Structures are given as C-alpha cells and as structure tokens.
Swiss-Prot record:
The modification N-acetylserine is found at residue 2. Its main location: cytoplasm. It comes from the Eukaryota. Belongs to the TDA2 family. This is Topoisomerase I damage affected protein 2. One of its GO terms (cellular component) is cell projection. It is found in: Cytoplasm; Cell projection. The keyword Signal does not apply. Keywords: Acetylation, Cell projection, Cytoplasm. The keyword Ribonucleoprotein does not apply. The lineage of its organism: Eukaryota, Fungi, Dikarya, Ascomycota, Saccharomycotina. It comes from Saccharomyces cerevisiae (strain YJM789). InterPro entries: Tctex-1-like_sf.
Length: 126
C-alpha cells in the first residue's frame, strides 16, 4: 500500500527565490543534517535543526524579508493496509501584503527513517 500526502495551496509566485531554488535549499539543508557526523539526530530534533538551517540560508539570500519556517513531522513507520489510518491538519494564517509577501509548502520524505516532513516557509517584506 502506498500512502500519498498532498500539499495544496501556497503563494510562491512572488518568492524572493525561484520555487526550484527553495526546493534545493530545503533539500540541501536536510542532506547536510544527515551527513553531519557531529549531530546526533536520535537526541536532537531534526525539525528544529532543519528550521535553523533553512532560515540561515534564506537570511543570507535576502535581508529584505522576514522569514518564518514551520516543519510538521509525520512518522509513517508501521503504517500498512490494516493500520493506515491517521489524520493531520495544520492551518496557518497571516496578515500581509499579497504583492510582496507569500508562502511556500513542500513535502520532504525520508524513506530510510520512515518520516515525512511537511515544510512551510513564509516571507514578509520588511
């Protein structure tokens, strides 16, 4: 059985980075966590470290924006045809100027750890 998680909505057409670059930035941040032998991911929160790395990279790219990053972690270990029932809802709202501010959602899956990360990045023009 294959579990499918879809991400809908978002407003990335006015992003300070092209969508492709945002995806690369997130993936590279995650890969660097996995490759760093000094980080013990069993004791440190992967999501908190990922948020920190993503925000650091975004801030280096442009100081014209304030950034907010959110990571929702799903542990999909043990899901099978008999036990494939889970529910997740995450809502976020912001008051912004739609021509300058926006939001980007991304799903990052780690097949090795049976975890899926739902990442949201918001940018607000200063």
């Amino acid at each position: 059985m294959s579990m499918q998680i879809e991400i809908k909505d978002g407003r990335s057409d006015n992003s300070p980075l092209p969508e492709r670059k945002l995806v690369t930035l997130i993936q590279e941040s995650y890969d660097s966590l996995k490759d760093d032998n000094e980080i013990n991911l069993s004791t440190e929160s992967t999501s908190n470290l990922l948020i920190k790395l993503v925000l650091e990279k975004l801030e280096k790219h442009s100081s014209l924006y304030k950034y907010i990053a959110s990571v929702t972690t799903l542990n999909i270990e043990g899901l099978n045809e008999e036990n494939a029932n889970f529910s997740l809802k995450n809502d976020i709202g912001a008051s912004w100027e739609s021509k300058k501010d926006g939001i980007f959602n991304y799903k990052l899956e780690d097949k090795n750890s049976n975890e899926c990360y739902l990442i949201t990045i918001l940018w607000l023009h200063k």
